[in-house]
């Protein structure tokens, strides 16, 4: 039995498989918040479809490149203080800062790495 697949069909199949994972929308909340040193801060991120644990959190300060804090939803990047933690899987994720420090005042972003454009 000939099991060869025409190249065109294989190409279409690969496009379909890739397309099934694209166009994932990420919604972060709150969009802004007021907090004081010592506060416990929680930021949430929701994906429009399941992304398993393919979720990263970044911190960015003005004029600086984003800094990776958390990868794979809950793994702390080397050198990042333990007051930062991440949790969640599927569609709902949380970044928590257990006790806000002066150097933590920044912008925080979530990023899914389940699919790429």
From Swiss-Prot:
Membrane-spanning intervals of the chain: none
Species assigned in the record: Homo sapiens
Region (Complementarity-determining-1): 46-56
Name the UniProt record assigns to this protein: Immunoglobulin kappa variable 1-39
Region of interest called Complementarity-determining-2, as start-end residue ranges on this chain: 72-78
Signal sequence region: 1-22
Phylogenetic lineage: Eukaryota, Metazoa, Chordata, Craniata, Vertebrata
Disulfide bonds: 45-110
InterPro entries tied to this protein: Ig-like_dom, Ig-like_dom_sf, Ig-like_fold, Ig_sub, Ig_V-set, IgV_Light_Chain
Keyword Transmembrane belongs to the record: no
Keywords: Adaptive immunity, Cell membrane, Disulfide bond, Immunity, Immunoglobulin, Immunoglobulin domain, Membrane, Secreted, Signal
PROSITE patterns cross-referenced by the UniProt entry: IG_LIKE
CDD domains: IgV_L_kappa
Protein function: V region of the variable domain of immunoglobulin light chains that participates in the antigen recognition. Immunoglobulins, also known as antibodies, are membrane-bound or secreted glycoproteins produced by B lymphocytes. In the recognition phase of humoral immunity, the membrane-bound immunoglobulins serve as receptors which, upon binding of a specific antigen, trigger the clonal expansion and differentiation of B lymphocytes into immunoglobulins-secreting plasma cells.
Gene3D superfamilies per UniProt: Immunoglobulins (2.60.40.10)
Region called Framework-3, residue ranges: 79-110
């Amino acid at each position: 039995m000939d099991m060869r697949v025409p190249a065109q069909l294989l190409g279409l199949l690969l496009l379909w498989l890739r397309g099934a994972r694209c166009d994932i929308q990420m919604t972060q909340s709150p969009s802004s918040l007021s907090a004081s040193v010592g506060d416990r801060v929680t930021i949430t991120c929701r994906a429009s479809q399941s992304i398993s644990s393919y979720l990263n959190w970044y911190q960015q300060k003005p004029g600086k490149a984003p800094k990776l804090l958390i990868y794979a939803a809950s793994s702390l990047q080397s050198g990042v203080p333990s007051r930062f933690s991440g949790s969640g899987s599927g569609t709902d994720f949380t970044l928590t800062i257990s006790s806000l420090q002066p150097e933590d005042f920044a912008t925080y972003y979530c990023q899914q790495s389940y699919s790429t454009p």
